[in-house]
Swiss-Prot record:
Top-rank lineage group of the source organism: Eukaryota
Gene: TIS11
GO-annotated biological processes: electron transport coupled proton transport; intracellular iron ion homeostasis; negative regulation of cytoplasmic translation; nuclear-transcribed mRNA catabolic process; response to iron ion starvation
Function: Binds to specific AU-rich elements (ARE) in the 3'-untranslated region of target mRNAs and promotes their degradation. In response to iron deficiency, promotes the decay of many mRNAs encoding proteins involved in iron-dependent pathways. Recruits the DHH1 helicase to the SDH4 mRNA and promotes SDH4 mRNA decay. Also destabilizes target mRNA by modulating 3'-end processing, creating extended transcripts that are prone for degradation.
Alphabetical list of PROSITE patterns matching this protein: ZF_C3H1
Protein name: mRNA decay factor CTH2
Length: 285
């Protein structure tokens, strides 16, 4: 007679699936309040770690249904697959049912193509061989364009300066420093002629110096020199102009008066014909 064998597994080898919410009614009973607290903790954990922009719509419906659902008191466990599903814990992991080509496609999507023709807006470029070659090619072109712009901008300025100078002004005297030293600190801004090319002889006029210079009479010299508006020397120097023929309207009376003045200058003091005699006498030359 064959007897039926009964095999009992020891308690240490039992693999009863339990979850965080599974309780033993005799040792650790779980009430509704504690159950709701565990649900809220689980929901906060999902919101902080797992949920993202891509799977918000998929998991929101599950979370709302889990929160609104009130399980009966007799239920002792929840399906462990929902808690230990690696796809829910980390949504970036590839699923098991995908083909072997999934990792390659996943990597290709993350790859970024670099545009070799990209030029940044800033003028500072990285020091690479390609950038150095481009800069060396651009420099001669930029220098040629810059020099042409300089020439074009300088020409109108010269023309405007020539047009601004009036035609009535001209240089009638040579520059002393230029004629003696060969250089002038004023350069082109000098008011005197640098060489015979810039010198223009003034037309002769009939205006002569008739009043004697006070500095010439008292000191024997005048700091103004030839630019002085008064006469230096005796009245006999007017005869030079008369002989040259530039001053022909000299009357006999004026000649006689000039001779009398020249003869009587040594004996008698000449009268000052100015009105403010006292003011002139106080001046010290």
């Amino acid at each position: 007679m064959w007897a039926q064998l009964s095999y009992t597994r020891p308690e240490s080898q039992k693999t009863d699936l339990t979850s965080l919410f599974s309780t033993d009614q005799e040792q650790n009973p779980l009430n509704d309040y504690q159950y709701q607290i565990n649900i809220r903790e689980l929901e906060e954990y999902y919101n902080k770690t797992i949920l993202n922009e891509d799977n918000i719509q998929e998991t929101s419906s599950e979370i709302s249904s889990a929160v609104s659902f009130s399980p009966p008191k007799n239920t002792n466990a929840i399906q462990p697959g929902l808690l230990y599903d690696p796809q829910l814990m980390n949504p970036f992991l590839p699923s098991a049912h995908l083909n072997s080509t999934a990792p390659t496609t996943f990597k290709k999507k993350l790859e970024v193509q670099i545009n070799p023709d990209y030029v940044p807006k800033s003028s500072q470029l990285p020091l690479t061989s390609q950038n150095l070659q481009q800069l060396s090619q651009q420099k001669p072109k930029n220098d040629a364009s810059f020099s042409s712009e300089k020439e074009s901008s300088a020409q109108p300025k010269v023309k405007s300066q020539v047009q601004e100078t009036p035609k009535q002004l001209y240089k009638t005297e040579l520059c002393e420093s230029f004629t003696l030293k060969g250089s002038c600190p004023y350069g082109s801004k000098c008011q005197f002629a640098h060489g015979l090319g810039e010198l223009k002889v003034k037309k002769s006029c009939k205006n002569f110096r008739t009043k004697p210079c006070v500095n010439w009479e008292k000191l024997g010299y005048c700091p103004y020199g030839r630019r002085c508006c008064f006469k230096h020397g005796d009245d006999n120097d007017i005869a030079v102009y008369v002989k040259a023929g530039t001053y022909c309207n000299v009357s006999s009376t004026s000649k006689q008066s000039d001779e009398k003045r020249s003869n009587g200058r040594g004996s008698a003091k000449k009268k000052n014909l100015n009105v403010k005699v006292k003011a002139l006498q106080r001046m010290t030359w």
